[in-house]
């Protein structure tokens, strides 16, 4: 059986890390695309030269033309400008929207059957625009955000409780930005909910609130520390887990930026919700029961995303 083909559009820090993780997992052959000559070729060669040491067999290729992605099973999009200190994800909209238009055209021409994962910020608006530009079915185009935000939430909780991160479950709803909604009620440690752990004296509500805020600021914290770039290890790991669920048809339940067509009372919008990912792409959107406070926070987040989509339409009226 022929190996799967995974195309990476954008060969920066996330793109290179994606290629390395995919190689280590032997998920499929990798093609790296970038408009900068030499960068995708150099990274592909460097990672390929690590394969005898790490013992993996995949083909890695770098190129500067879109035809290299032809027939890809999965396309992961990281192309665009990354945040710098003092910038919000939303500040990138104008520049990265133009990039999504070019990427969408390339995917439409060469990889129209692929499962597409978008990482470019501002995430929810960019994946919405990318789906429109590419014309691919909505269930085959998703955004990577919820897994990353949930991973940050889980990591901070594991540090607070001094326990294995494997025993922490948590997920974050809403847009990938300041209005994201970490759901305390649905987050557990060893199956025990966070509100119950507060009652048991394991932590305080004040500390949980601090962790929620740190989760919201997770990306900005890394940007301020790095000074010349943004997070790439955790975003890459998150996207690979989504690609793996699709390629192996594992039916993973994960939070992603998915297209809503009435679920949660939202239409024609990409926003973070729990879904089932399998060979059909997004096979099911899971509608969880939200209390009044959670619903209000989610609606605020959706509104912020929709305003960004309106800003996209102002720049590219064809998206309407």
Curated annotation (Swiss-Prot):
Record has Oxidoreductase as a keyword: yes
Reaction(s) catalysed by this chain's protein: (S)-malate + NAD(+) = oxaloacetate + NADH + H(+)
GO BP terms in the entry: lactate metabolic process; tricarboxylic acid cycle
Residues reported in the UniProt entry to bind NAD(+): 10-15, 34, 96, 119-121
One Pfam family per UniProt: Ldh_1_N
Gene3D superfamilies per UniProt: Lactate dehydrogenase/glycoside hydrolase, family 4, C-terminal (3.90.110.10), NAD(P)-binding Rossmann-like Domain (3.40.50.720)
Binding sites annotated in the UniProt record for substrate: 83, 89, 121, 152
Cystine crosslinks: none
Active site: 176
EC numbers: 1.1.1.37
GO molecular function: L-lactate dehydrogenase activity; L-malate dehydrogenase (NAD+) activity
Keywords: NAD, Oxidoreductase, Tricarboxylic acid cycle
Its job: Catalyzes the reversible oxidation of malate to oxaloacetate.
The family this protein is said to belong to: Belongs to the LDH/MDH superfamily. MDH type 3 family.
Protein known as: Malate dehydrogenase
Species this chain originates from: Bartonella henselae (strain ATCC 49882 / DSM 28221 / CCUG 30454 / Houston 1)
